[in-house]
From Swiss-Prot:
It comes from Influenza A virus (strain A/Beijing/353/1989 H3N2). Plays critical roles in virus replication, from virus entry and uncoating to assembly and budding of the virus particle. M1 binding to ribonucleocapsids (RNPs) in nucleus seems to inhibit viral transcription. Interaction of viral NEP with M1-RNP is thought to promote nuclear export of the complex, which is targeted to the virion assembly site at the apical plasma membrane in polarized epithelial cells. Interactions with NA and HA may bring M1, a non-raft-associated protein, into lipid rafts. Forms a continuous shell on the inner side of the lipid bilayer in virion, where it binds the RNP. InterPro entries: Flu_matrix_M1, Flu_matrix_M1_C, Flu_matrix_M1_N, Flu_matrix_M1_N_sub1, Flu_matrix_M1_N_sub2, INFV_M1. Homodimer and homomultimer. Interacts with NEP. Binds ribonucleocapsid by both interacting with genomic RNA and NP protein. May interact with HA and NA. Cannot bind NP without genomic RNA. The keyword RNA-binding applies. The lineage of its organism: Viruses, Riboviria, Orthornavirae, Negarnaviricota, Polyploviricotina. A motif (Nuclear localization signal) lies at residues 101-105. It is a peripheral membrane protein. The gene is M. GO terms for cellular component: host cell nucleus; membrane; virion membrane. Its main location: virion. Keywords: Host nucleus, Membrane, RNA-binding, Viral matrix protein, Virion. This is Matrix protein 1.
Length: 252
């Protein structure tokens, strides 16, 4: 796996799924391929994105700044600085300085990532802030190692939280989660359907599924009524894809 592929993988792992994630993935691909060279426009676009947490925006802004060539005097962005200040906690800043001193002696991506993984996400973000604010300089490879370690820490805690929700025995939460997934799947089907003749059928199925979820929420149905809802939708989607000559099995 190339270095940039690894960075893209880690960064995207902390972005919530949805149309915005696809958009960010495209921007990262363009930046890493050298196709997007307007850092100012890129940062303005990032700043105004909804849904993303300030820290995720800060990390993305840091990655864009590392990758896109820019004039030396280009102003640092406040939204990135605020996100990478370790919540203003002096302990985070102390640890960040210690980490920075270690990273300065490191030259490889994997070496830097290994060192950084023993620090908390707050200290890692503060260390990124030091580098972003030009208070310290490390090689790009080392900076990317720091980014990936931070994303791994964040993704770990997100995964724990997700696992808790999936494993919950509370029927109401499970019911709502199944309806949310069915609704999201229906939305994705509508986007994939396009404008072909067969698309009308897929659109109709997706639309009916969304109306059904709305009705279930409006009248308050039994928690078991949503069982299999998403899987039924996915079966319909795969039937439609086969007719279109597309073979993509791994949606479940």
């Amino acid at each position: 796996m190339s270095l940039l592929t690894e960075v893209e993988t880690y960064v995207l792992s902390i972005v919530p799924s949805g149309p915005l994630k696809a958009e960010i993935a495209q921007r990262l691909e363009d930046v890493f391929a050298g196709k997007n060279t307007d850092l100012e426009a890129l940062m303005e676009w990032l700043k105004t994105r909804p849904i993303l947490s300030p820290l995720t925006k800060g990390i993305l802004g840091f990655v864009f700044t590392l990758t896109v060539p820019s004039e030396r005097g280009l102003q640092r962005r406040r939204f990135v600085q605020n996100a990478l200040n370790g919540n203003g906690d002096p302990n985070n800043m102390d640890r960040a300085v210690k980490l920075y001193r270690k990273l300065k002696r490191e030259i490889t991506f994997h070496g830097a990532k290994e060192i950084a993984l023993s620090y908390s996400a707050g200290a890692l973000a503060s260390c990124m802030g030091l580098i972003y604010n030009r208070m310290g300089a490390v090689t790009t490879e080392v900076a990317f190692g720091l980014v990936c370690a931070t994303c791994e820490q964040i993704a770990d805690s997100q995964h724990r939280s997700h696992r808790q929700m999936v494993a919950t025995t509370n029927p109401l939460i499970r019911h709502e989660n199944r309806m949310v997934l069915a609704s999201t799947t229906a939305k994705a089907m509508e986007q994939m359907a396009g404008s072909s003749e067969q698309a009308a059928e897929a659109m109709e199925i997706a639309s009916q599924a969304r109306q059904m979820v709305q009705a279930m929420r409006a009248i308050g149905t039994h928690p078991s009524s949503s069982t299999g809802l998403k899987d039924d939708l996915l079966e319909n989607l795969q039937t439609y894809q086969k007719r279109m000559g597309v073979q993509m099995q791994r949606f479940k």
